[in-house]
Protein backbone atom coordinates (compact mmCIF):
# COMPACT_ATOMS: atom_id res chain seq x y z
CA UNK A 1 0.00 0.00 0.00
CA UNK A 2 1.38 3.45 -0.90
CA UNK A 3 2.57 5.92 1.71
CA UNK A 4 2.65 9.70 1.50
CA UNK A 5 5.01 11.29 4.01
CA UNK A 6 6.76 11.16 7.36
CA UNK A 7 9.20 13.10 9.54
CA UNK A 8 12.33 11.90 11.29
CA UNK A 9 13.35 14.00 14.28
CA UNK A 10 17.06 14.50 14.90
CA UNK A 11 19.18 16.28 17.49
CA UNK A 12 22.49 17.76 16.35
CA UNK A 13 24.80 19.96 18.38
CA UNK A 14 27.25 20.64 15.54
CA UNK A 15 30.29 18.80 16.89
CA UNK A 16 29.05 15.20 17.23
CA UNK A 17 27.07 12.78 15.06
CA UNK A 18 23.42 13.59 14.51
CA UNK A 19 21.11 11.47 16.70
CA UNK A 20 17.72 10.07 15.70
CA UNK A 21 15.14 10.79 18.40
CA UNK A 22 12.12 9.16 16.74
CA UNK A 23 10.26 8.69 13.49
CA UNK A 24 6.84 10.28 13.06
CA UNK A 25 5.56 8.00 10.32
CA UNK A 26 1.79 8.30 10.71
CA UNK A 27 0.56 11.76 11.77
CA UNK A 28 3.44 14.27 11.54
CA UNK A 29 2.39 17.92 11.80
CA UNK A 30 4.28 21.22 11.28
CA UNK A 31 4.22 20.27 7.59
CA UNK A 32 2.58 23.50 6.44
CA UNK A 33 5.16 25.57 8.30
CA UNK A 34 8.09 23.58 6.93
CA UNK A 35 6.97 23.22 3.32
CA UNK A 36 5.39 26.62 2.74
CA UNK A 37 6.04 29.30 5.35
CA UNK A 38 9.68 28.35 5.75
CA UNK A 39 10.15 29.06 2.03
CA UNK A 40 8.38 32.42 2.39
CA UNK A 41 10.81 33.25 5.22
CA UNK A 42 13.74 32.47 2.91
CA UNK A 43 12.44 34.82 0.22
CA UNK A 44 11.72 37.60 2.74
CA UNK A 45 15.14 37.17 4.36
CA UNK A 46 16.85 37.44 0.96
CA UNK A 47 14.98 40.63 0.09
CA UNK A 48 15.65 42.26 3.47
CA UNK A 49 19.35 41.39 3.43
CA UNK A 50 19.26 39.22 6.55
CA UNK A 51 20.88 36.46 4.50
CA UNK A 52 22.82 36.59 1.19
CA UNK A 53 20.71 36.82 -1.96
CA UNK A 54 22.18 33.55 -3.22
CA UNK A 55 21.38 31.67 0.02
CA UNK A 56 19.34 28.53 -0.51
CA UNK A 57 17.28 26.14 1.57
CA UNK A 58 17.03 22.36 1.52
CA UNK A 59 13.30 22.34 0.94
CA UNK A 60 11.58 20.54 -1.91
CA UNK A 61 8.76 19.29 0.31
CA UNK A 62 5.86 20.91 -1.53
CA UNK A 63 7.15 19.97 -4.98
CA UNK A 64 7.64 16.39 -3.89
CA UNK A 65 4.18 16.20 -2.29
CA UNK A 66 2.54 17.37 -5.51
CA UNK A 67 4.62 14.88 -7.47
CA UNK A 68 3.63 12.09 -5.09
CA UNK A 69 -0.06 12.90 -5.43
CA UNK A 70 0.42 12.73 -9.20
CA UNK A 71 1.90 9.26 -8.77
CA UNK A 72 -1.15 8.26 -6.71
CA UNK A 73 -3.60 9.61 -9.28
CA UNK A 74 -6.95 7.89 -9.67
CA UNK A 75 -10.32 9.02 -10.97
CA UNK A 76 -11.85 8.13 -7.62
CA UNK A 77 -12.23 11.17 -5.32
CA UNK A 78 -9.48 11.47 -2.71
CA UNK A 79 -11.01 12.23 0.69
CA UNK A 80 -9.13 14.17 3.36
CA UNK A 81 -10.18 13.99 6.98
CA UNK A 82 -9.27 14.95 10.53
CA UNK A 83 -11.11 15.45 13.81
CA UNK A 84 -13.26 18.46 14.57
CA UNK A 85 -11.87 21.17 16.88
CA UNK A 86 -8.25 20.52 15.87
CA UNK A 87 -7.10 23.71 14.16
CA UNK A 88 -3.52 22.59 13.51
CA UNK A 89 -4.62 19.27 12.04
CA UNK A 90 -7.26 21.02 9.93
CA UNK A 91 -4.62 23.39 8.49
CA UNK A 92 -2.30 20.50 7.68
CA UNK A 93 -5.06 18.54 5.97
CA UNK A 94 -6.19 21.57 3.95
CA UNK A 95 -2.62 22.11 2.81
CA UNK A 96 -2.28 18.48 1.70
CA UNK A 97 -5.65 18.68 -0.03
CA UNK A 98 -4.41 21.71 -1.97
CA UNK A 99 -1.28 19.79 -3.02
CA UNK A 100 -3.51 16.95 -4.25
CA UNK A 101 -5.63 19.38 -6.25
CA UNK A 102 -2.50 20.86 -7.85
CA UNK A 103 -1.64 17.31 -8.91
CA UNK A 104 -5.00 16.97 -10.65
CA UNK A 105 -6.76 14.91 -7.99
CA UNK A 106 -10.44 15.40 -7.25
CA UNK A 107 -10.48 15.93 -3.49
CA UNK A 108 -13.16 16.23 -0.82
CA UNK A 109 -12.93 17.05 2.88
CA UNK A 110 -14.87 15.32 5.65
CA UNK A 111 -14.47 15.26 9.41
CA UNK A 112 -13.68 11.93 11.04
CA UNK A 113 -16.82 12.30 13.14
CA UNK A 114 -18.95 12.51 9.95
CA UNK A 115 -17.73 9.26 8.39
CA UNK A 116 -20.50 6.72 8.02
CA UNK A 117 -20.84 2.99 7.47
CA UNK A 118 -22.92 1.67 4.61
CA UNK A 119 -24.22 -1.78 3.77
CA UNK A 120 -21.50 -4.37 4.17
CA UNK A 121 -19.30 -2.06 6.21
CA UNK A 122 -18.29 0.31 3.40
CA UNK A 123 -17.17 3.79 4.42
CA UNK A 124 -19.47 6.64 3.31
CA UNK A 125 -19.58 10.43 3.33
CA UNK A 126 -22.52 12.64 4.36
CA UNK A 127 -24.15 12.12 0.95
CA UNK A 128 -23.82 8.33 1.21
CA UNK A 129 -21.10 8.23 -1.43
CA UNK A 130 -18.77 5.28 -0.91
CA UNK A 131 -15.25 6.35 0.04
CA UNK A 132 -12.63 4.35 -1.85
CA UNK A 133 -9.52 6.12 -0.56
CA UNK A 134 -8.81 8.67 2.11
CA UNK A 135 -5.99 10.53 3.79
CA UNK A 136 -6.51 10.81 7.52
CA UNK A 137 -4.63 12.88 10.06
CA UNK A 138 -5.79 10.53 12.78
CA UNK A 139 -3.58 7.97 14.53
CA UNK A 140 -3.78 4.44 13.21
CA UNK A 141 -3.71 3.00 16.73
CA UNK A 142 -6.87 5.00 17.54
CA UNK A 143 -8.54 3.60 14.42
CA UNK A 144 -7.63 0.06 15.45
CA UNK A 145 -9.06 0.59 18.94
CA UNK A 146 -12.31 2.18 17.76
CA UNK A 147 -15.50 0.11 17.78
CA UNK A 148 -15.20 -0.32 14.02
CA UNK A 149 -11.49 -1.10 14.13
CA UNK A 150 -11.97 -4.76 13.09
CA UNK A 151 -13.31 -3.51 9.74
CA UNK A 152 -9.79 -2.33 8.86
CA UNK A 153 -8.84 -5.96 8.28
CA UNK A 154 -11.38 -6.19 5.46
CA UNK A 155 -9.63 -3.39 3.56
CA UNK A 156 -12.55 -2.04 1.56
CA UNK A 157 -10.90 1.36 1.21
CA UNK A 158 -7.34 2.56 0.81
CA UNK A 159 -5.97 4.57 3.71
CA UNK A 160 -3.13 7.04 3.55
CA UNK A 161 -1.15 6.58 5.68
CA UNK A 162 -1.43 2.77 5.23
CA UNK A 163 -1.77 0.28 8.06
CA UNK A 164 1.89 -0.78 7.93
CA UNK A 165 2.84 2.72 9.06
CA UNK A 166 1.54 1.78 12.53
CA UNK A 167 4.72 -0.28 12.93
CA UNK A 168 7.10 2.50 11.95
CA UNK A 169 5.26 5.12 14.02
CA UNK A 170 5.62 2.92 17.12
CA UNK A 171 8.49 4.19 19.29
CA UNK A 172 9.28 0.56 20.02
CA UNK A 173 11.17 0.86 16.75
CA UNK A 174 13.98 2.66 18.60
CA UNK A 175 14.94 -0.20 20.99
CA UNK A 176 14.75 -2.62 18.05
CA UNK A 177 17.10 -0.48 15.97
CA UNK A 178 19.52 -0.29 18.92
CA UNK A 179 19.31 -4.07 19.34
CA UNK A 180 20.10 -4.65 15.66
CA UNK A 181 22.74 -1.89 15.41
CA UNK A 182 24.22 -1.44 18.91
CA UNK A 183 26.52 1.53 19.21
CA UNK A 184 25.52 3.05 15.87
CA UNK A 185 26.67 6.70 15.94
CA UNK A 186 23.30 8.03 14.74
CA UNK A 187 21.19 6.08 17.26
CA UNK A 188 20.51 6.68 20.93
CA UNK A 189 20.74 3.77 23.35
CA UNK A 190 17.15 2.57 23.83
CA UNK A 191 15.42 -0.28 25.63
CA UNK A 192 11.95 -1.51 26.50
CA UNK A 193 10.40 -1.17 29.93
CA UNK A 194 11.51 -4.12 32.07
CA UNK A 195 14.73 -4.67 30.12
CA UNK A 196 18.27 -3.95 31.26
CA UNK A 197 19.32 -0.32 30.93
CA UNK A 198 21.53 0.36 27.92
CA UNK A 199 23.32 3.36 29.44
CA UNK A 200 25.95 3.69 32.14
CA UNK A 201 24.96 4.41 35.73
CA UNK A 202 24.62 8.11 36.39
CA UNK A 203 23.53 9.07 32.86
CA UNK A 204 20.28 10.89 32.14
CA UNK A 205 17.50 9.20 30.21
CA UNK A 206 13.99 9.68 28.84
CA UNK A 207 10.82 7.61 29.16
CA UNK A 208 8.35 7.71 26.25
CA UNK A 209 5.04 6.00 25.45
CA UNK A 210 5.27 3.83 22.35
CA UNK A 211 2.41 5.89 20.91
CA UNK A 212 2.05 9.59 21.68
CA UNK A 213 1.73 12.93 19.96
CA UNK A 214 3.56 16.21 20.53
CA UNK A 215 5.60 14.94 23.46
CA UNK A 216 2.66 13.75 25.53
CA UNK A 217 3.61 11.82 28.72
CA UNK A 218 7.35 12.06 28.04
CA UNK A 219 9.48 12.16 31.22
CA UNK A 220 13.15 13.15 31.60
CA UNK A 221 15.19 11.62 34.45
CA UNK A 222 18.62 12.63 35.71
CA UNK A 223 21.37 10.14 36.51
CA UNK A 224 19.94 9.56 40.00
CA UNK A 225 16.50 8.62 38.60
CA UNK A 226 14.94 11.92 39.69
CA UNK A 227 12.29 13.46 37.43
CA UNK A 228 13.73 16.57 35.78
CA UNK A 229 10.79 17.35 33.51
CA UNK A 230 7.47 15.75 32.59
CA UNK A 231 4.79 16.45 29.99
CA UNK A 232 1.19 15.56 30.71
CA UNK A 233 -0.93 13.86 28.09
CA UNK A 234 -3.37 11.12 27.23
CA UNK A 235 -0.86 8.30 26.76
CA UNK A 236 0.07 7.28 30.31
CA UNK A 237 -1.43 3.81 29.86
CA UNK A 238 0.70 2.98 26.83
CA UNK A 239 3.71 0.64 27.13
CA UNK A 240 6.91 2.64 27.58
CA UNK A 241 10.40 2.70 26.13
CA UNK A 242 13.52 4.28 27.59
CA UNK A 243 16.12 6.22 25.66
CA UNK A 244 19.39 7.96 26.47
CA UNK A 245 18.78 11.67 26.98
CA UNK A 246 20.08 13.85 24.16
CA UNK A 247 19.84 17.59 24.91
CA UNK A 248 18.81 19.86 22.06
CA UNK A 249 21.12 22.73 21.08
CA UNK A 250 20.00 26.09 22.40
CA UNK A 251 20.03 29.38 20.50
CA UNK A 252 18.93 32.24 22.74
CA UNK A 253 15.65 31.13 24.27
CA UNK A 254 14.98 28.49 21.61
CA UNK A 255 15.87 24.81 21.40
CA UNK A 256 16.40 23.48 17.89
CA UNK A 257 15.29 20.11 16.58
CA UNK A 258 15.84 18.96 12.99
CA UNK A 259 12.70 17.63 11.36
CA UNK A 260 13.79 15.70 8.28
CA UNK A 261 10.84 15.29 5.94
CA UNK A 262 10.33 12.23 3.76
CA UNK A 263 7.82 11.95 0.93
CA UNK A 264 7.23 8.31 0.04
CA UNK A 265 10.77 6.99 0.63
CA UNK A 266 12.74 10.09 -0.39
CA UNK A 267 14.18 12.76 1.91
CA UNK A 268 13.16 16.16 0.57
CA UNK A 269 13.61 18.88 3.18
CA UNK A 270 14.15 20.00 6.75
CA UNK A 271 12.06 22.16 8.99
Which stretches of residues belong to each language-model region?
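Domain-scale recognition of functional cores that engage charged ligands
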Residues: 13-15, 30-33, 38-271
Amino acid sequence: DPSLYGRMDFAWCGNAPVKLLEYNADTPTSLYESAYFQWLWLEDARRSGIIPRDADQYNAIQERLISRFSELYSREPFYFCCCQDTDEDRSTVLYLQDCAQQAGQESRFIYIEDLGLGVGGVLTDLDDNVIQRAFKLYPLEWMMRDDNGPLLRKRREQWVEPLWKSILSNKGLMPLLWRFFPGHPNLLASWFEGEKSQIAAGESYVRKPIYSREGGNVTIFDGQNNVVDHADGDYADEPMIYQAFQPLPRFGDSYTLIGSWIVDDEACGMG
